Amino acid sequence: MAFDKKLLEIVACPVCKGTLILNKDSNGNERLVCRFDRLAYPIEQNIPVLLETEALVLSSEELEKIK
C-alpha cells in the first residue's frame, strides 16, 4: 500500500511549515521532501516520520533531481 497523496494537502514540513513533495529515494523507498530545508522525511509502513531528527539532509545534487 502506497502513501495516500491526499495527505500532502494537509501535512507540512515540521521545520519551516512549507510544502512537502512525495519522492522516492534511490532504493525506491517513498519519502517526503522539503526543498526549502533540503530535508527528506522517511515514510515507514505508510506513515510519514515527520521528525527533524529522523530526516536526511539532501545534497544540492540530490535536490536538483527532485521535481
Swiss-Prot record:
Matches recorded under PANTHER family: PROTEIN PREY, MITOCHONDRIAL (PTHR33505:SF4), ZGC:162634 (PTHR33505)
Record organism: Pseudoalteromonas atlantica (strain T6c / ATCC BAA-1087)
Q: Which InterPro entries match?
A: Trm112-like
Q: Which Gene3D superfamilies match?
A: 2.20.25.10
Record-linked HAMAP family: UPF0434
By sequence similarity, the record places it as follows:
Belongs to the UPF0434 family.
This protein's name: UPF0434 protein Patl_1782
A Pfam family matched in the record: Trm112p
Can you quote a single GO CC term?
cytosol
